[in-house]
Amino acid sequence: MAKKPVKDLKQLGHATPVPASPEEATLERVPNPHPDANYVARFTVPEFTSLCPVTGQPDFAHLVIDYVPGKWLIESKSLKLYLQSFRNHGAFHEDCTLAIGKRLAGTLAPKWLRIGGYWYPRGGIPIDVFWQKGKLPAGVWVPDQGVAPYRGRG
């Protein structure tokens, strides 16, 4: 891949503080070197954190983001910083999960994208949130997200 796209990045290779909020975070993208191929790129985030908008208590989730790129790939440092910006952000589980999926879809215009948000129990109830954009191209292999259903002590 050409070096020019890397040169244009503002976060990769630079000391970059965690943004104060998801709205302030910058998601960067790079050209997909294989836009003609249908393949899945996966990001697994086992320690995602946000805040309950009512109590201010921390909420934790295991996120799995799968997408079939079009012309663009997400630059992973910018994704990491974006996700870390939720650490002090108050929002319900559904809002966090869909906000991430929609922001990625808007930035990348992928052929297909899905996000699974597997939220750890609060008040004894785990909440799993799933969102998908687009139709999966034929013939693309997408592995199971690999997150076991919550069983507690049952």
Swiss-Prot record:
Substrate binds at I74, E75, S76, H93, E94. Residues 1-31 are annotated as: Disordered. Its EC number is 1.7.1.13. Pathway: tRNA modification; tRNA-queuosine biosynthesis. The keyword Ribonucleoprotein does not apply. The keyword NADP applies. GO terms for biological process: queuosine biosynthetic process; tRNA modification. Signal peptide: none annotated. InterPro entries: GTP-CH-I_C/QueF (IPR043133), NADPH_dep_7-cyano-7-deazaG_red (IPR050084), QueF (IPR029500), QueF_type1 (IPR016856). Residues 1-11 have a biased composition (Basic and acidic residues). One of its GO terms (molecular function) is preQ1 synthase activity. Catalyzes the NADPH-dependent reduction of 7-cyano-7-deazaguanine (preQ0) to 7-aminomethyl-7-deazaguanine (preQ1). This is NADPH-dependent 7-cyano-7-deazaguanine reductase. It comes from Parvibaculum lavamentivorans (strain DS-1 / DSM 13023 / NCIMB 13966).
